[in-house]
Amino acid sequence: MKKLLFLGALLLSTVCMNAQTSEYYQEAANPIATNPALWAKVTAPQISWGSTDIRYKKEEPAPIHSAQKSMNLTAWKGEKISAQLVVWTPKALNDLTFMVSDLTSGSATISKENIRTGFVRYVITDELNKDGLGACGYRNSADFDSTLVADVIDHITPTLTLPANSTQGGWISVNIPQGTKAGKYTGTVTVKADGITLSELKLNLQVKNRTLPPPSEWAFHLDLWQNPYAVSRYYNVEPFSKKHFDLMRPLMKLYADAGGKVITASIMHKPWNGQTYDAFESMVTWLKKADGTWYFDYTVFDKWVEFMMDLGVKKQISCYSMVPWRLSFQYFDQASNSFKFLDAKPGEVAYEEFWMNMLQDFSKHLKAKGWFDITHIAMDERPMKDMQETLKVIRKADKDFKVSLAGTYHKELLDDLNDYCITIVEKFTPEEIEVRRKAGKVTTYYTCCTEPRPNTFTFSEPAEAEWLAWHSAKENLDGYLRWALNSWVKNPLQDSRFTAWAAGDTYMIYPGARSSIRLERLTEGIQFFEKVRILKEEFEEKGNKGAIKNINKTLKMFDESSMDKISPTTAVNKAKKVINRY
């Protein structure tokens, strides 16, 4: 047993790298020089409500001609809703801070404890490929324009110093308790700097007499792949130690609070080779004993799954991957006391024997834990022959194993896949979606570096992230997948660029459990998906065909082929007004 414990530690070892572990940090220098001429007409600090649709440029005055001192929002009970204020100043401001009051409606109150403020901070980004058609492929940062962009929502830093001739956004999020009384609530956001009040902004919130269920009960199937190894590297802690889990808890809670449904588990060494800055290691120890039999240790896998379930992510476990990018499988060979690799591909006897041993043992373990029914053996898109051969092995190991695929549309795989996710440009037929839904199967879509928009790069329009969930509603799909929640780059708080794909492609949350404009807007879209679902169910029960027709007409705006005619920003804002009327 001691040898096995040592082996587990060995498999979890990681190269110690310097990481910025302090929760207070300096932003990267702005690669774009400030143009004094743009600031010539700004003679004093300006404060206004802005728009969550805009990433305000640090080096330019906010494009607001008349300061807006009052903001009107509408929400359901149980909803989280956000607004953005903006400060731009010709002179330096010290100790800039935002303070919120309670929101009141007669004797009813939404406590300020349910309101979070944060600075919208800046990170380096880049751009699409030069042809503008996507963002895939390895890239040299020198070949792309780099700028600072507003994305990080920093709720940790209490005050900031704002240099002269610069702009700073502030993000205000209100979590409306489910037991809140319907009505119009009012409160204030006070902006202070240098010990004095610069402005008081009024916040008006209309709470409708409708209730959104908690995120754990949302129907929307959100699958953002988690990378625990990035967290251990960044903070220089032992993977899956108590310290590691303590650091991950608030990070992964962001995912749970967004309605995350799927736990990402790596059951073999580097399922995606080395495509991320921090490679995924195996959460399962593979040991070939001296007598030729196999031993599998699930200690790390179990810890990880239990940790995520405790946060409320418990609908599905996706295990990657029997068909990795590189068909080479690592295990520890006791006879030689060394790591070895088996090079084999689906359809070969060696491949089948290798995976049969593991899957049969894994099946027993999952059943003992009570997790078998929610566990999926997960794959990325691979050649059809490889996927079909892999399915044969899975079914031979245990005919009841569930299988998921994020890839392209293959009609011949519809019945075999319990969770099927295809590209945004491909379409399931309405009949296929309904047949799968009645069978309890999940049907979703994904975006990646291929799509110029809609997307969630750090330079993408904020509304694009929200548009994604509306599109799921329009297509009658169950949800959305994006491959990376937190596969951080070297210095994620300063520079979101990576050696492959556009900036921000690899992560949506930041160290310190800082959210992003992208995640907040994606979550708002998911909330509206739930609103649409709830309203349509109600109207179908009541026979309100007119309301259903109106909602379906509204959803037609969320077509990826018509974004040049109706931008994501326009579509989202129009649709929200329609839904919030009910």
Q: Predicted segment positions?
A:
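Short, glycine/acidic-rich beta->alpha junctions
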Residues: 77, 244-247, 296-300, 385-386, ...
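Aromatic- and acid-rich polysaccharide-binding/catalytic face
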Residues: 401-427
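Aromatic-lined carbohydrate-binding surfaces of glycoside hydrolases
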Residues: 145, 166, 174-175, 186-193, ...
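Catalytic domains of carbohydrate-active enzymes that cleave complex glycans
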Residues: 330-331, 339, 343-409, 493-582
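Mature N-terminal, pre-catalytic/accessory segment of carbohydrate-active enzymes
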Residues: 19-273, 372, 565-582
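Active-site clefts of carbohydrate-active enzymes
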Residues: 437-466
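Substrate-binding cleft of secreted/luminal carbohydrate-active enzymes
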Residues: 461-507
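Bacterial Sec-dependent N-terminal signal peptides
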Residues: 1-22
